[in-house]
Amino acid sequence: MVRSTLRIIFFILISLASAEAATFKELVKSQAKITPNISIFIKNLSTNEVIVSYRANKRMIPASNQKIITTLTSLDLLGEDFKFSTYIFLLDKINEKGIYSGNIYIDSRGDPSLSSSKLKDAVNFFKEKDLKVIQGNIIIDNTYFESPEYNKNWKNSWKGSYWAPYISSIAVDNNLYKSGGTFLLTDNPLYLLGVKFRKILRSNGIIFKGNIVLKEIPLRDKLVPFKIIYEINSPSLSNLVYIVNKESDNLY
């Protein structure tokens, strides 16, 4: 329904260039036969001239049209080439036996497109550093995005729905995990990141017996100059915005 409405609006706006004011209302009415849920108000902000007004006071649910505002703002503020980064790092050296005695840290900063394949690349990076054993925990920073994790105005019955995802500074594999042959949506994206990263560590022969811990990574640890660090970058913002709007992806 949303995509159909957007196509109709696009057709109407394109037609504005050639339609006279007197015939425009007839044009809108013809489209209203396809869907009655049309409300249009177009105003020239420079002259305050109302260009089009059709059922302007009809209350409408903006729905996915809001994505246009948020994505346009992000492009304006960050630029189309901006990329979200995720940092995975160790704070100390790996000894000659391949043993690392500390924690491994994941600092996630808003990438909605992270995948298990990129986590595998990170694990391969640490394997090349001769990492064989991690004696500490997986620490995942859970403070980059503010609370709440779930919109307080959303119904509890919506939880677990793909169109009402939890708000998190990371999404790995679209926040999906497999259980009994079925893909399910997690209600704890950061913890799922830890679970998937732990699985990849072990499947690549790296011994890990610690826990997955969600907490703030102190700034002093993020700034340690000699840490071993791997950086994962998202596709460019312009590519992410395409997914948001073209596919109407609520997760992104």
Where do the PLM segments sit?
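Short, low-complexity, intrinsically disordered N-terminal peptides in bacterial proteins
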Residues: 1-4, 23
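Sec-dependent signal peptide recognition
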Residues: 3-11
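Hydrophobic h-region of N-terminal signal peptides that target proteins for export
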Residues: 10-20
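Beta-lactamase-like hydrolase cores
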Residues: 19-59, 124-130
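Conserved serine DD-peptidase/penicillin-binding transpeptidase domain
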Residues: 25-29, 77-252
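A common structural microfeature
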Residues: 37-39, 65, 85, 103
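Acidic active-site catalytic centers that drive phospho-/nucleotidyl reactions
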Residues: 44, 67, 141
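Short active-site loop at a secondary-structure junction
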Residues: 53-73, 77
